[in-house]
């Protein structure tokens, strides 16, 4: 059977999967090297590692979003999101749109909030840790307490779809994005970085860490963000302060990012790549 194998992550990319009882089997059979399988990776680093480790060629098809459909807007439902967080009109809503796992570098987000010298230093995190335990979350809370930052999980307010439970609104992640003033995404490692595409889609000011795949496959295309290089420095903090008070400059930059994303990470790009892939069978 002709098969397309689409690889988002490989076991060798995660330290937590390195201790196992079937390493020989994994190293020799996963993924399978067969003539009827065409392999797809989501970044150029994974492509190179797959070739080096298994001798398997692949094509890169990056993650995409429907950039030809305009993003949602603030409406009668989501206009209450900030107040449901307990925010006042002049408070900053700083969103970390990730799970609570160590490779997300959330300690850098906490430090950013601390160094912005806000009257109410708060960081809101959209998702729980899931299967990676609570030790990192406990450590983050201690770090935040030392730095005087109020870190809040808001997963109880966010669901796959909008709705109401016991007369309380449940919002979509898009509702959270639309209400934010600053998105933090200081990841140390990502297979691609969906939150980057999402932040581009909603045209919001974003600070990110230059993780390897970003450096290899996203930054060279011309996108512009506030960048960290593994740590928070005063230059980045000053840039955040300046842009938070420069909505026209943010609008210009985010519009340019949106146009670049339409060119490189749209559904039309995916369709063209899939047509090329299927034509090889």
PLM features: residue spans?
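Carbohydrate-associated surface elements
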Residues: 45, 64
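Conserved donor-binding/catalytic core segment of Leloir-type glycosyltransferases
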Residues: 82, 88-104, 110-113, 123-125
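Membrane-proximal helix-turn-helix segments that form the acceptor-binding/catalytic region
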Residues: 11, 20-40, 48, 52-53
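Nucleotide-activated donor-binding/catalytic signature segment of Leloir-type glycosyltransferases, i.e.
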Residues: 134-175
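Aromatic "clamp/platform" in nucleotide-sugar-dependent glycosyltransferases that forms part
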Residues: 188
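Short hydrophobic beta-strand element within catalytic cores of glycosyltransferases
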Residues: 205-209, 225
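A charged, aromatic-enriched C-terminal amphipathic alpha-helix characteristic of glycosyltransferases
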Residues: 244-278
């Amino acid at each position: 059977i002709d098969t397309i194998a689409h690889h988002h992550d490989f076991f060798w990319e995660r330290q937590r999967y390195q201790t196992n009882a079937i390493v020989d089997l994994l190293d020799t059979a996963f993924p399978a090297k067969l003539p009827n399988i065409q392999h797809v990776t989501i970044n150029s680093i994974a492509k190179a590692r797959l070739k080096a480790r298994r001798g398997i060629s692949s094509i890169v098809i990056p993650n995409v979003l429907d950039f030809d459909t305009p993003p949602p807007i603030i409406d009668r439902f989501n206009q209450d999101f900030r107040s449901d967080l307990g925010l006042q009109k002049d408070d900053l809503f700083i969103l970390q749109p990730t799970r609570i796992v160590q490779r997300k570098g959330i300690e850098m987000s906490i430090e950013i909030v601390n160094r912005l010298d806000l009257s109410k230093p708060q960081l809101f995190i959209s998702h729980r840790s899931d299967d990676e335990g609570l030790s990192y979350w406990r450590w983050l809370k201690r770090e935040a307490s030392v730095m005087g930052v109020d870190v809040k999980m808001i997963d109880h307010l966010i669901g796959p779809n909008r709705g109401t439970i016991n007369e309380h609104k449940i919002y979509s992640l898009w509702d959270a994005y639309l209400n934010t003033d600053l998105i933090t995404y200081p990841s140390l490692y990502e297979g691609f970085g969906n939150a980057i595409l999402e932040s581009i889609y909603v045209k919001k000011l974003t600070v990110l860490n230059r993780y390897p795949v970003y450096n290899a496959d996203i930054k060279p295309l011309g996108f512009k963000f506030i960048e960290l290089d593994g740590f928070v420095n005063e230059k980045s903090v000053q840039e955040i302060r300046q842009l938070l008070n420069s909505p026209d400059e943010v609008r210009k930059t985010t519009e340019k990012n949106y146009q670049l994303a339409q060119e490189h990470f749209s559904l039309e790009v995916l369709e063209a790549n899939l047509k090329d892939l299927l034509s090889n069978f």
